[in-house]
Amino acid sequence: MQTRTTPGAMLKAMREKPPLVQCITNYVAMNIAANVLLAAGASPAMVHAAEEAGEFAAIASALTINIGTLSTQWIDGMQAAAKAATSAGKPWVLDPVAHYATAFRRNAVAELLALKPTIIRGNASEIIALAGGESRGQGVDSRDPVEQAEGSARWLAERQRAVVAVTGAVDFVTDGERAVRIEGGSALMPQVTALGCSLTCLVGAFAATAPEDIFGATVAALSTFAIAGEEAALGAAGPGSFSWRFLDALAALDAETLDARARISAA
Protein backbone atom coordinates (compact mmCIF):
# COMPACT_ATOMS: atom_id res chain seq x y z
CA MET A 1 0.00 0.00 0.00
CA GLN A 2 1.45 3.33 -1.07
CA THR A 3 0.83 5.38 2.06
CA ARG A 4 3.19 7.14 4.45
CA THR A 5 2.35 5.11 7.53
CA THR A 6 0.33 2.08 8.60
CA PRO A 7 -3.33 1.97 9.62
CA GLY A 8 -2.26 0.90 13.09
CA ALA A 9 0.09 3.84 13.48
CA MET A 10 -2.71 6.21 12.46
CA LEU A 11 -5.12 4.60 14.94
CA LYS A 12 -2.56 4.97 17.72
CA ALA A 13 -1.90 8.61 16.79
CA MET A 14 -5.62 9.37 16.77
CA ARG A 15 -6.05 7.99 20.27
CA GLU A 16 -3.05 9.87 21.58
CA LYS A 17 -4.45 13.15 20.27
CA PRO A 18 -8.23 12.75 19.77
CA PRO A 19 -9.51 14.91 16.90
CA LEU A 20 -12.71 16.94 17.23
CA VAL A 21 -14.93 15.82 14.36
CA GLN A 22 -17.96 17.86 13.35
CA CYS A 23 -20.57 15.42 12.08
CA ILE A 24 -23.43 16.90 10.10
CA THR A 25 -25.27 13.63 9.74
CA ASN A 26 -28.83 12.40 9.65
CA TYR A 27 -31.19 11.88 12.56
CA VAL A 28 -31.00 8.10 12.22
CA ALA A 29 -27.19 8.08 12.42
CA MET A 30 -26.40 10.61 15.15
CA ASN A 31 -26.30 8.21 18.09
CA ILE A 32 -24.35 5.40 16.48
CA ALA A 33 -21.98 7.80 14.71
CA ALA A 34 -21.11 9.55 17.96
CA ASN A 35 -20.58 6.23 19.73
CA VAL A 36 -18.38 4.89 16.93
CA LEU A 37 -16.14 7.95 17.15
CA LEU A 38 -15.91 7.64 20.93
CA ALA A 39 -15.07 3.93 20.68
CA ALA A 40 -12.36 4.65 18.13
CA GLY A 41 -10.85 7.38 20.28
CA ALA A 42 -12.10 10.55 18.59
CA SER A 43 -14.37 13.32 19.87
CA PRO A 44 -17.73 13.80 18.07
CA ALA A 45 -19.70 17.03 17.74
CA MET A 46 -23.11 16.83 16.07
CA VAL A 47 -23.36 20.51 15.09
CA HIS A 48 -25.54 21.25 12.06
CA ALA A 49 -27.51 24.49 12.59
CA ALA A 50 -26.81 27.08 9.91
CA GLU A 51 -26.37 29.72 12.61
CA GLU A 52 -23.25 28.01 13.98
CA ALA A 53 -22.12 25.25 11.60
CA GLY A 54 -19.59 27.42 9.80
CA GLU A 55 -18.17 28.91 12.96
CA PHE A 56 -17.78 25.46 14.48
CA ALA A 57 -16.16 23.98 11.36
CA ALA A 58 -13.37 26.52 11.65
CA ILE A 59 -12.37 25.14 15.06
CA ALA A 60 -13.06 21.44 14.45
CA SER A 61 -10.29 19.10 13.32
CA ALA A 62 -12.42 17.73 10.47
CA LEU A 63 -15.94 17.93 9.05
CA THR A 64 -18.23 15.21 7.72
CA ILE A 65 -21.44 15.88 5.79
CA ASN A 66 -24.13 13.23 5.29
CA ILE A 67 -27.32 14.16 3.40
CA GLY A 68 -29.48 11.34 4.75
CA THR A 69 -32.27 13.45 6.27
CA LEU A 70 -32.11 16.57 4.16
CA SER A 71 -33.87 19.93 4.48
CA THR A 72 -33.30 23.46 3.22
CA GLN A 73 -32.11 24.53 6.66
CA TRP A 74 -29.66 21.65 6.83
CA ILE A 75 -28.28 22.49 3.39
CA ASP A 76 -27.53 26.02 4.58
CA GLY A 77 -25.59 24.60 7.52
CA MET A 78 -23.76 22.11 5.32
CA GLN A 79 -22.65 24.76 2.87
CA ALA A 80 -21.54 27.14 5.61
CA ALA A 81 -19.53 24.39 7.29
CA ALA A 82 -17.93 23.18 4.05
CA LYS A 83 -16.87 26.71 3.10
CA ALA A 84 -15.40 27.31 6.56
CA ALA A 85 -13.56 23.98 6.61
CA THR A 86 -12.05 24.66 3.20
CA SER A 87 -11.00 28.18 4.21
CA ALA A 88 -9.40 26.84 7.39
CA GLY A 89 -7.60 24.05 5.55
CA LYS A 90 -9.53 21.32 7.38
CA PRO A 91 -10.38 18.03 5.65
CA TRP A 92 -14.04 17.34 5.01
CA VAL A 93 -15.92 14.25 3.89
CA LEU A 94 -19.08 14.10 1.76
CA ASP A 95 -21.48 11.16 2.07
CA PRO A 96 -24.03 11.64 -0.76
CA VAL A 97 -26.73 9.35 0.63
CA ALA A 98 -29.25 8.36 -2.08
CA HIS A 99 -28.48 11.57 -3.96
CA TYR A 100 -29.94 10.05 -7.11
CA ALA A 101 -33.41 9.64 -5.56
CA THR A 102 -34.80 13.19 -5.99
CA ALA A 103 -34.00 16.47 -7.72
CA PHE A 104 -33.71 18.12 -4.30
CA ARG A 105 -30.92 15.74 -3.32
CA ARG A 106 -29.17 15.94 -6.68
CA ASN A 107 -29.07 19.73 -6.52
CA ALA A 108 -27.82 19.72 -2.93
CA VAL A 109 -24.98 17.35 -3.76
CA ALA A 110 -24.01 19.30 -6.89
CA GLU A 111 -23.64 22.42 -4.75
CA LEU A 112 -21.59 20.54 -2.15
CA LEU A 113 -19.32 19.01 -4.79
CA ALA A 114 -18.57 22.53 -6.01
CA LEU A 115 -17.16 23.23 -2.54
CA LYS A 116 -14.50 20.55 -3.12
CA PRO A 117 -14.78 17.80 -0.50
CA THR A 118 -11.49 16.21 0.48
CA ILE A 119 -13.03 12.73 0.51
CA ILE A 120 -16.21 11.29 -0.98
CA ARG A 121 -17.56 8.13 0.69
CA GLY A 122 -20.51 6.23 -0.71
CA ASN A 123 -21.87 2.87 -1.76
CA ALA A 124 -21.48 1.61 -5.31
CA SER A 125 -24.81 2.91 -6.58
CA GLU A 126 -24.14 6.37 -5.16
CA ILE A 127 -20.67 6.62 -6.70
CA ILE A 128 -21.81 5.34 -10.10
CA ALA A 129 -24.63 7.89 -10.20
CA LEU A 130 -22.34 10.66 -8.96
CA ALA A 131 -20.05 9.99 -11.92
CA GLY A 132 -22.99 10.27 -14.31
CA GLY A 133 -23.62 6.56 -14.77
CA GLU A 134 -26.85 4.61 -14.46
CA SER A 135 -27.05 2.99 -11.04
CA ARG A 136 -29.53 0.50 -9.62
CA GLY A 137 -29.78 2.05 -6.18
CA GLN A 138 -33.03 1.61 -4.28
CA GLY A 139 -33.51 4.32 -1.68
CA VAL A 140 -30.40 4.32 0.50
CA ASP A 141 -29.45 0.76 -0.50
CA SER A 142 -26.98 -0.16 -3.21
CA ARG A 143 -27.96 -2.70 -5.84
CA ASP A 144 -24.63 -2.45 -7.66
CA PRO A 145 -21.47 -4.39 -6.72
CA VAL A 146 -18.41 -2.41 -5.67
CA GLU A 147 -16.35 -3.64 -8.61
CA GLN A 148 -18.95 -2.12 -10.95
CA ALA A 149 -18.19 1.30 -9.43
CA GLU A 150 -14.39 1.20 -9.57
CA GLY A 151 -14.13 2.99 -12.91
CA SER A 152 -16.62 5.62 -11.78
CA ALA A 153 -14.65 6.15 -8.58
CA ARG A 154 -11.39 6.70 -10.46
CA TRP A 155 -13.06 9.19 -12.81
CA LEU A 156 -14.73 11.02 -9.94
CA ALA A 157 -11.49 11.20 -7.95
CA GLU A 158 -9.65 12.73 -10.89
CA ARG A 159 -12.42 15.19 -11.65
CA GLN A 160 -12.90 16.31 -8.06
CA ARG A 161 -9.25 15.97 -7.04
CA ALA A 162 -10.48 14.04 -4.04
CA VAL A 163 -10.10 10.61 -2.51
CA VAL A 164 -13.12 8.44 -3.30
CA ALA A 165 -14.10 5.45 -1.17
CA VAL A 166 -16.65 2.91 -2.39
CA THR A 167 -17.79 0.70 0.46
CA GLY A 168 -19.41 -2.71 0.28
CA ALA A 169 -18.42 -6.37 0.52
CA VAL A 170 -14.89 -5.41 -0.57
CA ASP A 171 -14.09 -1.70 -0.25
CA PHE A 172 -12.32 0.31 -2.94
CA VAL A 173 -10.33 3.51 -2.39
CA THR A 174 -8.70 5.69 -5.04
CA ASP A 175 -7.27 9.15 -5.50
CA GLY A 176 -7.39 8.81 -9.27
CA GLU A 177 -3.84 7.46 -9.47
CA ARG A 178 -3.44 4.98 -6.62
CA ALA A 179 -6.13 2.46 -5.78
CA VAL A 180 -6.55 -0.33 -3.24
CA ARG A 181 -9.14 -2.89 -2.20
CA ILE A 182 -9.86 -3.65 1.44
CA GLU A 183 -11.35 -6.98 2.47
CA GLY A 184 -13.06 -7.79 5.74
CA GLY A 185 -16.16 -6.87 7.65
CA SER A 186 -19.29 -8.94 8.14
CA ALA A 187 -22.55 -9.64 6.34
CA LEU A 188 -24.28 -8.34 9.48
CA MET A 189 -22.99 -4.81 8.97
CA PRO A 190 -25.62 -3.73 6.40
CA GLN A 191 -28.32 -4.97 8.80
CA VAL A 192 -27.47 -2.29 11.39
CA THR A 193 -29.05 0.98 10.34
CA ALA A 194 -26.69 3.93 9.86
CA LEU A 195 -23.54 1.91 10.51
CA GLY A 196 -22.25 3.01 7.11
CA CYS A 197 -23.04 6.62 8.00
CA SER A 198 -20.88 6.22 11.10
CA LEU A 199 -18.03 5.04 8.88
CA THR A 200 -18.10 8.42 7.14
CA CYS A 201 -17.51 10.08 10.52
CA LEU A 202 -14.64 7.68 11.25
CA VAL A 203 -13.06 8.57 7.91
CA GLY A 204 -13.17 12.20 9.02
CA ALA A 205 -11.42 11.34 12.28
CA PHE A 206 -8.56 9.58 10.50
CA ALA A 207 -8.29 12.41 7.96
CA ALA A 208 -7.92 14.86 10.83
CA THR A 209 -5.15 12.71 12.29
CA ALA A 210 -3.21 12.47 9.02
CA PRO A 211 -4.21 15.42 6.82
CA GLU A 212 -0.92 15.08 4.96
CA ASP A 213 -1.91 11.58 3.78
CA ILE A 214 -5.63 11.63 2.99
CA PHE A 215 -5.45 8.49 0.86
CA GLY A 216 -3.74 6.55 3.65
CA ALA A 217 -6.10 7.95 6.26
CA THR A 218 -9.13 6.78 4.28
CA VAL A 219 -7.64 3.31 3.86
CA ALA A 220 -6.86 3.19 7.58
CA ALA A 221 -10.42 4.12 8.54
CA LEU A 222 -11.97 1.50 6.29
CA SER A 223 -9.51 -1.15 7.50
CA THR A 224 -10.31 -0.32 11.13
CA PHE A 225 -14.03 -0.62 10.42
CA ALA A 226 -13.58 -3.93 8.59
CA ILE A 227 -11.55 -5.59 11.35
CA ALA A 228 -13.93 -4.38 14.06
CA GLY A 229 -16.79 -5.83 12.01
CA GLU A 230 -15.08 -9.20 11.72
CA GLU A 231 -14.40 -9.33 15.44
CA ALA A 232 -17.93 -8.23 16.35
CA ALA A 233 -19.45 -10.98 14.22
CA LEU A 234 -17.77 -13.68 16.31
CA GLY A 235 -20.50 -14.95 18.60
CA ALA A 236 -23.11 -12.41 17.48
CA ALA A 237 -26.57 -13.96 17.30
CA GLY A 238 -27.85 -11.35 14.87
CA PRO A 239 -27.83 -7.61 14.11
CA GLY A 240 -28.88 -6.64 17.63
CA SER A 241 -26.00 -8.26 19.47
CA PHE A 242 -23.67 -7.39 16.60
CA SER A 243 -24.32 -3.66 17.02
CA TRP A 244 -23.07 -3.49 20.61
CA ARG A 245 -20.31 -6.01 19.95
CA PHE A 246 -19.11 -3.73 17.16
CA LEU A 247 -18.57 -0.82 19.55
CA ASP A 248 -16.74 -3.10 21.98
CA ALA A 249 -14.57 -4.52 19.20
CA LEU A 250 -13.72 -1.07 17.90
CA ALA A 251 -12.77 0.16 21.37
CA ALA A 252 -10.61 -2.93 21.99
CA LEU A 253 -8.83 -2.87 18.63
CA ASP A 254 -5.16 -1.98 18.98
CA ALA A 255 -2.58 -0.84 16.45
CA GLU A 256 -0.73 -4.15 16.31
CA THR A 257 -3.87 -6.18 15.70
CA LEU A 258 -5.07 -3.77 13.03
CA ASP A 259 -1.80 -3.94 11.11
CA ALA A 260 -1.61 -7.72 11.43
CA ARG A 261 -5.16 -8.36 10.23
CA ALA A 262 -5.80 -5.60 7.69
CA ARG A 263 -6.19 -7.06 4.20
CA ILE A 264 -5.25 -4.33 1.75
CA SER A 265 -4.23 -5.03 -1.84
CA ALA A 266 -3.34 -2.87 -4.82
CA ALA A 267 -6.12 -2.48 -7.38
UniProtKB/Swiss-Prot annotation:
Its EC number is 2.7.1.50. HAMAP family: Thz_kinase (MF_00228). CDD domains: THZ_kinase. This is Hydroxyethylthiazole kinase. The lineage of its organism: Bacteria, Pseudomonadati, Pseudomonadota, Alphaproteobacteria, Hyphomicrobiales. ATP binds at residues 121, 167. GO terms for molecular function: ATP binding; hydroxyethylthiazole kinase activity; magnesium ion binding. Substrate binds at residues 46, 194. InterPro entries: Hyethyz_kinase (IPR000417), Ribokinase-like (IPR029056). Its cofactor is Mg(2+). GO terms for biological process: thiamine biosynthetic process; thiamine diphosphate biosynthetic process. Pathway: Cofactor biosynthesis; thiamine diphosphate biosynthesis; 4-methyl-5-(2-phosphoethyl)-thiazole from 5-(2-hydroxyethyl)-4-methylthiazole: step 1/1. Pfam families: HK (PF02110). The gene is thiM. It catalyses: 5-(2-hydroxyethyl)-4-methylthiazole + ATP = 4-methyl-5-(2-phosphooxyethyl)-thiazole + ADP + H(+). Belongs to the Thz kinase family. It comes from Rhizobium johnstonii (strain DSM 114642 / LMG 32736 / 3841) (Rhizobium leguminosarum bv. viciae). Catalyzes the phosphorylation of the hydroxyl group of 4-methyl-5-beta-hydroxyethylthiazole (THZ). Keywords: ATP-binding, Kinase, Magnesium, Metal-binding, Nucleotide-binding, Plasmid, Thiamine biosynthesis, Transferase.
